[in-house]
Amino acid sequence: MRVLPATLLVGAATAAVPPFQQQFQQVLGIPQEEVEQAAPVAPSAPTTPKPLQIFQDQLKSLSDEARKLWDEVSNFFPDSMDHNPVFSLPKKHTRRPDSHWDHIVRGSDVQGVWVTGADGEKQREVDGKLEAYDLRVKKTDPSALGIDPGVKQYTGYLDDNENDKHLFYWFFESRNDPENDPVVLWLNGGPGCSSLTGLFMELGPSSINEKIKPVYNEYSWNSNASVIFLDQPVNVGYSYSGSAVSDTVAAGKDVYALLTLFFKQFPEYAKQDFHIAGESYAGHYIPVFASEILSHKKRNINLQSVLIGNGLTDGYTQYEYYRPMGCGEGGYPAVLDKGTCQSMDNALPRCQSMIKSCYESESSWVCIPASIYCNNALIGPYQRTGQNVYDVRGKCEDESNLCYKGMGYVSEYLNKAEVRQAVGAEVDGYDSCNFDINRNFLFHGDWMKPYHRLVPGLLEQIPVLIYAGDADYICNWLGNKAWTEALEWPGQKEYASAEMEDLVIEQNANTGKKIGQVKSHGNFTFMRIYGGGHMVPMDQPESGLEFFNRWLGGEWF
């Protein structure tokens, strides 16, 4: 089915635009062959679900305004509306027997624990619906992989047996003082990209070189913290499912269950401070996940703060800063010509109008067109230049691997049979990013929903750090600084007026070196990191570890 075409608005992107599938493929850097393989549709299968086929009945009841939005984006992307299946396909997998695992923590057992409260009444030890969940745990031999020998490691799966979901995690104990150092959960974005890319390309104990061998990382974030890397949502990385998660809120329930069962199995870590950190689409995830945790008053998760790096959190504010960043106003030379910059300026009012409608209704019918239109008008022009969307300083060196050859090295390493065996992976293959997941989230309207509205509630209880490498385009520092200043909360005026101060290294051979700028008031802090792209710990490992350690030490809160 196709919706009726509508006249394009003046001010839309003037250059020819790629079809919807190709456009978002470029955002994630996923090769065409992977997209085609991920959605094999036989010509003789006319009943394969398609976005507008699935929505056909509901479209009849749309308001005139919503229908016009769909008409508009259909005119931009007619082919994509006909040919893209909505739902992700299950990954091939072989579940390992229970005897493979050292521990299996049953959610039903945890939920069944009752204690006597201060008032003498019986109450559950921890909140939450956990009976459908299990946690499988295996102590991993570091020597088998050559990754951080001497550091305790655990891998395993969180199982949602009711919904056939299985999330893979990899835990590294702190190199320093694991009995006292904090615990951090790390999340990559996408949506649909594996957190193991963060492990091996950014902040984990090893990177993978061109010989597909692990190389020790002296700037690993487990230098002074224990770190959990989680492949979520399902069907990302080593995780798998027969069903799908298509929005951030649903994914939050899984993360709460994982942490609750993990800390039940390892109470020695539960007593430590706990923090959530992540980047990119984790700007959506983290406000939701932290709010989910804090909503449970009886919990064994000692959440102390959250850190979001180069995140997408408030689209209305952040999309305004694509044109300035691409046109030379972000501290680096312009990538786009004057005509393109003007076209983006012309498109912005319509984009923001659509995002505003999404914020007001939070309806998928309104939020999906906003995502498609705004990404086409404000990200598409930059993509067509061939420049790296994650770093304005250079060209995209490897389109099949998010512009980075290192991403391919990581995928090749994690697809080795001996690696999958060592960590207990149950899938037949590893993918750095799953395009189907990205599309699922978009077609559920998740991309533009106002998750930033949860941040004031977080600020009432815990500190929040927003940091941004200043060479990134896709989630650039201008937009991240702007949304933090626009956020409505009791400390808004004081925070917005706070001056940016130099951020300098304090304790090593480079003491006094300026690595960025920082501003802070109350529980809210923003950092600009010089010379960092979308992945700060990869581009500026020393700077990343410096601010990370100082943040966990409580310097700004």
UniProtKB/Swiss-Prot annotation:
Glycan attachment sites: N224, N523
Family of the protein in this entry: Belongs to the peptidase S10 family.
EC number: 3.4.16.5
Listed Pfam families: Carbpep_Y_N (PF05388), Peptidase_S10 (PF00450)
Disulfide bonds: C193-C433, C327-C341, C351-C374, C358-C367, C396-C403
Keyword hit for Magnesium: no
Pro-sequence residue ranges: 18-138
Catalytic activity: Release of a C-terminal amino acid with broad specificity
Organism for this UniProt entry: Aspergillus terreus (strain NIH 2624 / FGSC A1156)
Any GO CC annotation of this UniProt entry: fungal-type vacuole
One Gene Ontology term of the molecular function aspect: serine-type carboxypeptidase activity
One GO BP annotation of this record: proteolysis
InterPro entries, sorted: AB_hydrolase_fold, Peptidase_S10, Propeptide_carboxypepY, Ser_caboxypep_ser_AS
Protein's name according to its UniProt entry: Carboxypeptidase Y homolog A
Task of the protein: Vacuolar carboxypeptidase involved in degradation of small peptides. Digests preferentially peptides containing an aliphatic or hydrophobic residue in P1' position, as well as methionine, leucine or phenylalanine in P1 position of ester substrate.
Keyword annotations: Carboxypeptidase, Disulfide bond, Glycoprotein, Hydrolase, Protease, Signal, Vacuole, Zymogen
Residues at the catalytic site: S280, D472, H534
Signal peptide start and end residues: 1-17
